C-alpha cells in the first residue's frame, strides 16, 4: 500500500521570485519609480500598458523616456515565467501551458475557449499540500506558494493570447494547481488586480471569478468579510465525514458541517450562490444514499444558494479509481435535484492533454 502524502498547510520556505510590478501596491510602485528618478504620473502610464494593453516589456512602452525603459524593466518587470510547452486539444479550443519559474519550479495553467466566453484556469501554488488521493496535483506535494506577480501574470499572458486572436478573456477560475485559500493574502490581492478596472487591473467582473477550496473553513469566512462578489466553489466530493476524511484529508480538521456553515456565511455576506464540486468516483462516492444525503445537507445548510457541479472523475496516472458510468451520473443528478438542489454535470475539457480537473501535475517530461 502506498504511503499517504502528508497534509501541508504552510508552504516550504523557498526563495520567492524577484519583485514584480504586480507584487507592489501603488505606494510601493511610486517609491520604486522615485528611486529611478521618475515622477509619480509615470505609474499610470505603466499600469495602462500592463493591465490595459497587456504589455510586460517596458522597452515597448514608447511614452516612457527612452533612457529609463531598461531601468524600469530591470526594477519592476523581471521575467517571472517562461513557457516550456504548450499543448492543445478539443479542436484547439483548450490550451495547457507548462511554465518554468525563476527557480526551476513548474506550474500549469489552462485556457479554455467556448462559443460565448473564454475561461482561464490558474494556479495559486506550485503543487498542492492538501493531499487528496484522487488528484494528481495533491499527490505531487507542495513546492511553494506563488507570488502575486506569478498569479497575475498567468492572467495577463492568457488575456494577451485571447487579444491576439481577436477575443477577450472573460472568466477566471482558481482551480489549477494549489489550494487558493492556503495562499490567502496573495490570492486576494491577485483577485483585486484581476477585477479592478484599468489602469488598476484587468477589468474582469468579480462575478466572473471563481475561487475554489477544499474547505478551509476559517479562510472561507475571512474571504466573505472581504466583501467581494467572486464565486466560492467548495470541493466537497462526499457528504459524510467518514469518507471525506480519506478523500479530502483536510476534513479531519474542518468536517462537513463546519465547511457548509462557513459556505452559508459566505453566501449570506456575498449574496452569491455557492458551487459545490463533486468528483463522481465509481463505487466510492456515487451511491444513491450519498446523493440523497448530499441533497438534504446542502438544502438544509444553503437553501437556494447552492449548485452542485458534478465532475466525472478524470483519470490520473496510477490511480486505482475511475469515473462512475453515465447511468450512475444521471441517477445521482436526479436524486440531488429531487432534494431541491440544482445539479449539473460539468462539461469536462482537456482530458486528452491531462488539463482537466485533478490532472495538473506539471511534469517537464510529459
From Swiss-Prot:
Annotated residues for binding of S-adenosyl-L-methionine: 178-179, 212, 235-237, 314
Gene Ontology biological process terms from the UniProt entry: rRNA base methylation; tRNA methylation
Domain of life: Bacteria
Listed GO MF terms: 4 iron, 4 sulfur cluster binding; metal ion binding; rRNA (adenine(2503)-C2-)-methyltransferase activity; rRNA binding; tRNA (adenine(37)-C2)-methyltransferase activity; tRNA binding
Disulfide bonds: 121-357
GO CC terms in record: cytoplasm
Residues that bind [4Fe-4S] cluster: 128, 132, 135
Needed cofactors: [4Fe-4S] cluster
Active site: 108 (proton acceptor), 357 (s-methylcysteine intermediate)
Keyword field contains Methyltransferase: yes
Pfam families associated with the record: Radical_SAM
Reactions accelerated catalytically: adenosine(2503) in 23S rRNA + 2 reduced [2Fe-2S]-[ferredoxin] + 2 S-adenosyl-L-methionine = 2-methyladenosine(2503) in 23S rRNA + 5'-deoxyadenosine + L-methionine + 2 oxidized [2Fe-2S]-[ferredoxin] + S-adenosyl-L-homocysteine; adenosine(37) in tRNA + 2 reduced [2Fe-2S]-[ferredoxin] + 2 S-adenosyl-L-methionine = 2-methyladenosine(37) in tRNA + 5'-deoxyadenosine + L-methionine + 2 oxidized [2Fe-2S]-[ferredoxin] + S-adenosyl-L-homocysteine
Subcellular location(s) of the protein: Cytoplasm
Domain Radical SAM core: 114-352
Annotated EC: 2.1.1.192
SUPFAM superfamilies tied to this protein: Radical SAM enzymes
Keywords, ordered alphabetically: 4Fe-4S, Cytoplasm, Disulfide bond, Iron, Iron-sulfur, Metal-binding, Methyltransferase, rRNA processing, S-adenosyl-L-methionine, Transferase, tRNA processing
Cofactor note: Binds 1 [4Fe-4S] cluster. The cluster is coordinated with 3 cysteines and an exchangeable S-adenosyl-L-methionine.
Additional remark text: Reaction proceeds by a ping-pong mechanism involving intermediate methylation of a conserved cysteine residue.
Its biological purpose: Specifically methylates position 2 of adenine 2503 in 23S rRNA and position 2 of adenine 37 in tRNAs.
Family: Belongs to the radical SAM superfamily. RlmN family.
Protein name: Probable dual-specificity RNA methyltransferase RlmN
Gene: rlmN
Amino acid at each position: 500500500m502506498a504511503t499517504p502524502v502528508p497534509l501541508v498547510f504552510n508552504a516550504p520556505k523557498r526563495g520567492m521570485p524577484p519583485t514584480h510590478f504586480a507584487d507592489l501596491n501603488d505606494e510601493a510602485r511610486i517609491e520604486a519609480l522615485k528611486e529611478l528618478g521618475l515622477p509619480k504620473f509615470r505609474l499610470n502610464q505603466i499600469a495602462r500598458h500592463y493591465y490595459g494593453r497587456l504589455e510586460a516589456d517596458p522597452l515597448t512602452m514608447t511614452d516612457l523616456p527612452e533612457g529609463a525603459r531598461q531601468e524600469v524593466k530591470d526594477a519592476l518587470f523581471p521575467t517571472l515565467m517562461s513557457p516550456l510547452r504548450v499543448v492543445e486539444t478539443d479542436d484547439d479550443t483548450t490550451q495547457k501551458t507548462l511554465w518554468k519559474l525563476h527557480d526551476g519550479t513548474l506550474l500549469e495553467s489552462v485556457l479554455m475557449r467556448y462559443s460565448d466566453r473564454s475561461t482561464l484556469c490558474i494556479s495559486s501554488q506550485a503543487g498542492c499540500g492538501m493531499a487528496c488521493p484522487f488528484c494528481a496535483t495533491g499527490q505531487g506535494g507542495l513546492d511553494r506558494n506563488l507570488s502575486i506577480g506569478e498569479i497575475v501574470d498567468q492572467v495577463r499572458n492568457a488575456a494577451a493570447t485571447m487579444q491576439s486572436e481577436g477575443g477577450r478573456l472573460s472568466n477566471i477560475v482558481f482551480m489549477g494547481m494549489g489550494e487558493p485559500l492556503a495562499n490567502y493574502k496573495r490570492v486576494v490581492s491577485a483577485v483585486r488586480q484581476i477585477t479592478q478596472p484599468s489602469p488598476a487591473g484587468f477589468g474582469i467582473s468579480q462575478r466572473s471569478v471563481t475561487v475554489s477550496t477544499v474547505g478551509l473553513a476559517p479562510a472561507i469566512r475571512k474571504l466573505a468579510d472581504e466583501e467581494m462578489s467572486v464565486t466560492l466553489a467548495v470541493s466537497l466530493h462526499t457528504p459524510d465525514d467518514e469518507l471525506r476524511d480519506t478523500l479530502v484529508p483536510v476534513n479531519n480538521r474542518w468536517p462537513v458541517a463546519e465547511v457548509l456553515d462557513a459556505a452559508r456565511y459566505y453566501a449570506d455576506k456575498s449574496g452569491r450562490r455557492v458551487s459545490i464540486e463533486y468528483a463522481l468516483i465509481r463505487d466510492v462516492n456515487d451511491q444513491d444514499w450519498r446523493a440523497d444525503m448530499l441533497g438534504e445537507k446542502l438544502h438544509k445548510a444553503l437553501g437556494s444558494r447552492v449548485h452542485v457541479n458534478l465532475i466525472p472523475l478524470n483519470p490520473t496516472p496510477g490511480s486505482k479509481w475511475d469515473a462512475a458510468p453515465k447511468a450512475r451520473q444521471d441517477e445521482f443528478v436526479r436524486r440531488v435535484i429531487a432534494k431541491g438542489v440544482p445539479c449539473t454535470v460539468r462539461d469536462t475539457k482537456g482530458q486528452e492533454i491531462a488539463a482537466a480537473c485533478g490532472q495538473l501535475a506539471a511534469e517537464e517530461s510529459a
